[in-house]
C-alpha cells in the first residue's frame, strides 16, 4: 500500500532465504494475485533486481503481479537530491536511507512526479527530461559532492523501466474494489511501523507516507468500511535503518 524499498522483508522459501522490498510477499503464494498499489513509490532498478531474483522460483510473474498506474516512480535524480540534502545538514541529519524516497513524495505532493501510467506514453521522456533539469538545479544549490554517478543510475533506471512496462499496468483501485464486491479476500501489506508515520511518528525522523492501518485506504483506494481485520506486530524496542 505504501511500500518502498527502504524496509526489506526476509523470508525463507523452500529452504532458501529471499529478500523483497517492492514486490508483495504474496508472490510466493500460488493462489494469490499481487498488486503494487497507488501509494507505493517504485525504484525501477530495485524492481528489476527483485524480478530477476524471483526467476529461480519458476513463478508466473506476468499473471501474478499487477502494478497501479498511479504509483509514483523514483528517478535517479531523486537519489542524488536525497544524498545531497542529507549531506548539507551536517550534524542535523534526519537519518535518510538515501534511496530517493522523500524527494519522490515531494514531487508527488508538488504535482510534478512521474507515475507508472506515464511511462507507457510515447512522450514520457520529455516530462522526465524537464523534471531532471529542475532536479539538477536543486542539486547544485546544495553545493555538496556526493558519490553517485547519474549516468550509471540512469542506465539502471531505464532498464528497470522496460521491465515495469512488461507487466500489467492497471487501475488498481477499480480492480481491488471489484474483487471485494465479488467476495474475494484482500490482504493489505504495509512496509513500516507506526513510529515512521508522517503524521503520527517521531517527526521529523519519519518516512514520507502514512504507515498506520488507515494508509490502506489512501494507498490502495479501498473505502474505510471495507477494512474488517487489522493485525499489528509489536516488538520490545525500536529499531531504525539508515542513521535514524
Q: Could you tell me what each predicted segment is?
A:
Residues 10, 14, 77-82, 109-111, ...:
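Short acidic, glycine/serine/threonine-rich loops at helix termini
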Residues 7, 16-31:
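Non-catalytic, usually N-terminal nucleic-acid engagement modules in DNA/RNA processing proteins
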Amino acid at each position: 500500500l505504501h511500500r518502498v524499498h527502504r524496509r526489506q522483508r526476509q523470508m525463507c522459501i523452500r529452504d532458501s532465504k529471499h529478500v523483497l522490498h517492492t514486490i508483495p510477499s504474496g508472490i510466493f503464494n500460488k493462489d494469490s494475485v499481487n498488486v503494487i498499489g497507488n501509494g507505493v513509490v517504485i525504484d525501477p532498478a530495485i524492481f528489476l533486481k527483485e524480478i530477476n531474483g524471483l526467476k529461480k522460483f519458476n513463478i508466473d510473474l506476468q499473471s501474478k503481479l499487477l502494478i497501479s498506474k498511479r504509483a509514483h516512480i523514483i528517478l535517479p535524480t531523486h537519489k542524488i537530491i536525497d544524498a545531497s540534502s542529507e549531506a548539507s545538514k551536517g550534524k542535523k541529519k534526519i537519518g535518510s536511507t538515501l534511496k530517493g524516497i522523500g524527494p519522490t513524495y515531494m514531487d508527488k505532493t508538488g504535482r510534478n512526479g512521474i507515475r507508472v501510467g506515464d511511462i507507457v506514453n510515447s512522450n514520457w521522456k520529455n516530462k522526465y527530461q524537464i523534471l531532471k533539469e529542475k532536479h539538477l538545479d536543486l542539486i547544485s544549490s546544495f553545493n555538496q559532492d556526493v558519490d553517485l554517478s547519474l549516468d550509471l543510475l540512469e542506465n539502471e533506471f531505464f532498464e528497470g523501466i522496460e521491465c515495469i512496462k512488461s507487466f500489467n499496468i492497471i487501475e488498481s483501485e477499480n480492480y481491488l474494489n471489484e474483487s471485494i464486491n465479488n467476495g474475494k479476500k484482500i490482504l493489505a501489506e504495509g512496509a513500516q511501523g507506526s513510529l515512521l508515520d508522517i503524521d503520527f511518528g517521531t517527526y521529523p525522523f519519519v518516512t514520507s507516507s502514512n504507515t498506520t492501518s488507515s494508509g490502506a485506504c489512501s494507498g490502495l483506494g479501498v473505502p474505510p468500511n471495507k477494512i474488517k481485520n487489522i493485525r499489528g506486530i509489536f516488538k520490545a524496542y525500536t529499531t531504525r535503518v539508515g542513521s535514524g
